[in-house]
Curated annotation (Swiss-Prot):
InterPro entries: SecB (IPR003708), SecB-like_sf (IPR035958)
A Pfam family recorded for this sequence: SecB
Protein name (record): Protein-export protein SecB
SUPFAM superfamilies: SecB-like
GO biological process, one term: protein tetramerization
Amino acid sequence: MTDANGAPAEAAPQIRMQVLAQYVRDMSFENMVAQKGLQGGDVQPDIQVQVSLDARKRSVEHQYEVITKFKVTSKNKSGAAETLFLMELDYGGIFHVENVPEEQMHPFLLIECPRLLFPFVRRIISDVTRDGGFPPLNIDTVDFLALYRMELARRAEAQKAAQPVQ
């Protein structure tokens, strides 16, 4: 390609991303059924999954830490809507990211990085629920782009509400 003067146009540098580490930062699983001595007879689980994300720059150049936080609650739809189990998982990754424009870094970290971590999160949740005495829970795929957009809209509303009316 050439620019308007006929000189070769410089190609944008290719984005480079490398996963340096993945880890469970924090995890808990509470089996309320076993704790309360409930029978597993008439159980109709209602699963709710809450997801939040966090990212921060590390002291090493081009390195970022991304944390995905999942809170999974299962309640019994029939009867008194008792909680069957509660699982909380903070799963992190350390990423080396280069050649992403500064204005695109925030969405890149909160959309693309969690997308890479998600299969591992799903597997951990499935294994832990199975090991906790329940059928394995394979949570639905998370649309991290939609989640990012919802968070931006929420922040814009909060900022708008915080401004004094004149």
